Regions:
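Membrane-embedded multi-pass helical conduit in multi-pass membrane proteins
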Residues: 239-311
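Short, well-formed alpha-helical segments that are part of the catalytic scaffolds
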Residues: 6-24
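A conserved acidic beta->alpha catalytic loop
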Residues: 20, 32-41, 55, 89-90
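Short beta-strand-to-loop acidic/aromatic patch adjacent to the donor-nucleotide binding site
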Residues: 76-90
Length: 321
């Protein structure tokens, strides 16, 4: 078993990330995507094998992880399981062994995840949103497209679907999950802590860029696998069609079309009650409901950006930090 840690300008977050892998007793490689800080030097100082991606090709998390697996198999060809960890996360020391035991037990299981926690959930409302987003029940994961970037994966399964799509600048994890599901594999979330994440998100602009990336991922998932149709249609309706209709009909309806804005209030109310019934506090439910509405517009921007990128044939990473 070994770990691939990926990063780009992670700063002070990288050292505890690499140290957490060492504390878990794992061999590891660090893959750097053109950092302008001292991340590569730090990895070298900690004696973690370093892979620096060639900047002549576009960077992507998928490309970094693929390169990391190649380096692991070059160094330790007997490796059966790989832990993927982002450089802004620290790994729980007991998780790799628990994940390996699950993969040993279930031959058709390709991926094992656990509970991801936000390190500073109260540092900002944006960190709080991430903390709420990470929460999900343990068990067999029915929706393979819900895969995130932190996981333990069976190397043979990873290779059977040719790894990550290196061209995907967002949504590369759901893309991998869908392809593994189509190949007959399953994903299990075990009821154990997996890692701690540091979102380091303190502005609406950062949140917006991250949400735009989510819309880009939605469009990519539908274009590649016809996955996420409902979510994509929702972004198209609430983020484009309804606002366009409201504006277009203002004059003919003498302003009555503005009443359609109430639709956003209705979906916000539904989201609020959903989270309240699931056990969240009223303040958390209210926070999620507001940003759920904002996300419809950000997702639409991401969808349009994906379409423009596809027409140009060029994709570049979307960074919020």
């Amino acid at each position: 078993m070994a770990a691939v840690v990926i990063g780009r300008n992670e700063g002070a977050r990288l050292e505890p990330s690499l140290q957490s892998v060492h504390a878990a007793g794992l061999r590891a490689v660090y893959v750097d995507s053109g950092s302008a800080d001292k991340s590569p030097a730090l990895a070298t100082k900690l004696e973690v094998p370093l892979v620096e991606l060639d900047c002549s090709r576009p960077f992507s998390a998928g490309r970094a992880r693929n390169e990391g697996v190649r380096e692991i198999l070059r160094r330790w060809p007997e490796t059966a399981y790989v832990v993927f960890l982002d450089g802004d996360c620290t790994l729980d020391a007991a998780f790799p062994a628990a994940a390996a035991a699950t993969l040993d037990e279930y031959a058709n299981c390709a991926i094992v995840t656990g509970h991801l926690a936000e390190r500073y959930p109260d540092a900002s409302i944006y960190n709080r949103l991430c903390s709420i987003e990470w929460a999900s029940p343990a068990g067999i994961v029915e929706t393979m497209s819900s895969l995130g970037g932190i996981m333990t994966i069976r190397v043979s399964a990873f290779q059977s679907v040719h790894g990550f799509n290196e061209q995907a600048i967002a949504g590369e994890e759901p893309d991998l999950g869908v392809r593994l599901g189509l190949a007959g594999y399953t994903m299990i979330k075990i009821d154990r802590p997996m890692a701690t994440h540091d979102a380091h998100m303190f502005s609406f602009r950062q949140w917006w860029i991250r949400a735009v990336r989510g819309g880009h991922a939605l469009a990519h998932g539908y274009a590649e696998h016809r996955e996420g149709r409902r979510e994509l249609l929702s972004a198209l309706f609430w983020g484009l069609a309804l606002p366009a209709a409201i504006l277009a009909l203002i004059w003919p309806t003498r302003g009555f079309s503005l009443l359609l804005v109430a639709g956003y209030g209705i979906i916000g109310w539904r989201v609020y009650w959903h989270y309240l019934r699931s056990g969240r506090t009223s303040s958390d439910a209210w926070l999620v409901s507001r940003f759920n509405i904002y996300s419809r517009f950000a997702h639409m921007v991401g969808v349009l950006r994906y379409c423009a990128n596809r027409l140009r044939g060029r994709f570049h990473i979307i960074e919020y930090k």
